[in-house]
Regions:
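N-terminal alpha-helical membrane-insertion module
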Residues: 1-63
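Ser/Thr-rich, low-complexity intrinsically disordered terminal regions
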Residues: 36, 55-176
């Protein structure tokens, strides 16, 4: 199945079912009883609306970020990338601390890398980012960059974690 179609279906169910259940619970609390018709209308209507709106905006933003072929990986809110850099561990840490896109994030030094926590913004509830040294390959260092939402149930991030990974990659790799 097409990854975009899978995402539409995933959002449809994960938004529609809870909304339908909450609306049914409200009816039960108000003494109106349970109605399958009302549950299905709430579930399908809200699920369809949220799926069409959120996934379409997500796809549009990813296209703006340069994604041309959609896969399960680049549609995911958990982004990872392996990057080769001439910077050693201490140089990489210094470079990230001085980068404008990352300087507002809380940085914690790990044994083989650095962990960053972004704050809550109007775009997200924050992200957890890791840049971990995997190995040394000749004169270069191989880093594993990962970015994921702080809120684990997030299903759409509008490309925020992809931007985080790309910003770190640009900061620690030489520009041609």
């Amino acid at each position: 199945m097409n990854p975009v179609t899978k995402l539409y279906i995933k959002v449809f169910f994960q938004a529609g079912i809870p909304f339908g259940l909450v609306m049914s619970a409200i009816d039960l609390i108000n003494g109106n009883g349970f109605s399958w018709e009302k549950f299905l209308f709430s579930f399908i209507g809200f699920g369809l609306f949220m799926s069409l709106a959120l996934v379409s905006i997500h796809i549009h933003r990813l296209k703006k970020l340069g994604v041309q072929k959609f896969t399960d990986e680049n549609l995911s809110v958990r982004q990872t990338k392996i990057v080769t850099s001439p910077l050693n561990l201490s140089e990489m840490k210094q470079k990230l601390k001085s980068d404008l896109a990352l300087e507002k994030m809380k940085m914690t030094e790990a044994q083989n890398g650095i962990l960053l926590d972004s704050k809550v913004t109007w775009k997200s509830w924050g992200e957890k980012i890791g840049v971990i040294l995997q190995c040394k390959d000749g004169g270069n260092y191989v880093y594993h960059i990962s970015s994921k939402p702080r809120l684990t149930r997030t299903i759409i991030d509008f490309g925020k974690n992809l931007v985080n990974v790309n910003n770190i990659e640009q900061a620690i790799t030489p520009h041609s």
